[in-house]
Amino acid sequence: VKPGALLGDIGYVIQQHAEGNYYSVVRDYCGHGIGRIFHEDPQVLHYGTPGTGMELVEGMTFTIEPMINAGKSGTKLKSDGWTVETRDGRLSAQWEHTLAVTATGVEVLTARYEERF
């Protein structure tokens, strides 16, 4: 992540890493921009085609929050209107970080001390 990179490149890397380890990427949910409104554009997909999507510029802030499934990528929303499950009943994991694009790369704003690099 750095100025000039494209959002499709981020999604592609996440997808390749997940699928390369025999997992799938949920396509029903995505990351998002952070600004004056909490969930705003751009949508940040966790799958994609390299060389596509919005160009990153210094000062952009957005989340990456992939949901990675042990089975297939399909999900279903439970009747409570909030809880999401995998369609095939397999395990899933989700995590989120907020990133800021800097002149020299990226700052992970939500990284715990032990995660900083």
Map each language-model feature to its residues.
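Active-site neighborhoods and metal-handling regions in enzymes and metal-associated proteins
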Residues: 1-117
